[in-house]
Amino acid sequence: MMDNITNQTKLDFVENFYAKLPHKPYCSDDLGYGVIIRPKKTAILKQYIQYNPPCLITSLVFDIDRSDAFFAWSDANLPTPTWIAKNRLNGHAHVGYMLATPVCTTHRARQNVIEYLAKIEQAYSLALGADRGYTGLITKNPCHSTWENHIFDVQPHELGYLADFVDLKELKTDLKEVSGLGRNCAMFDTVRFWAYKAIRAYLSGGFDKWHSEVIEQAKNANDAFIGVSTEFGSYRAVS
């Protein structure tokens, strides 16, 4: 399939990927030095880039840290991804599925759709053997020549189509097994139920004190779920 991909298909992908980027994505050429925020016309030139805008899921990306990562989707009988960006040295890869309909994740969004997407993400992560600690903020830029990039001639995926390839009913309910968007949903529920009960105790201290305590509760919730540290930005996003 990859050998038959035309230059026009690649150009169409780059145009579509660029259009869906945040206006000012996080990006980097070396994650060891952290990430910076730049206009997307600059960020698209970096090796690593934030692919989903704030509060909107346009693509699902999975981090597979093993030498045969390229074949993980095929071995798991999953649908063809939209792209794969592979490390030329060790074979590790990011596998991306672009969504036909982006999913809003704000408090105004439909919670059942978010939970549906989270279950799909969890099921794919398990099937692919992807890294559970990957938060989904930054990806290997599939438009950058550092990586061995493979663009597949497929249309963006509907959620229902993605769900047809996995059994959502068989997912584990243990929150410690949840990662990515599912972890954010679980953290949100845990923290909001605490907040409903605790807000009265913080009314006299002002917003800043209240906000700091909510973030602290989110950190504690995350540590309880996954047992590892998450980027501070993830706490702020769900809190």
Model-derived features with residue positions:
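Signature for HUH/AEP ssDNA processing cores
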Residues: 1-93, 99-115
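Catalytic "initiation/cleavage/transfer" segments centered on a nucleophilic residue
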Residues: 8, 35-40, 44-47, 114-192
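Hydrophobic, Leu/Ile/Phe/Ala-enriched alpha-helical segments that form helix-helix packing faces
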Residues: 74-78, 120-132, 214, 221-225
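A generic structural motif
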Residues: 83-90, 136-139, 232-235
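Short C-terminal domain-edge/linker segments immediately following a structured domain
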Residues: 90-96, 125-130
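Modules that initiate DNA replication and primer synthesis
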Residues: 100-103, 162-239
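Generic detection of long, well-ordered alpha-helical segments
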Residues: 110, 114, 118, 208-212
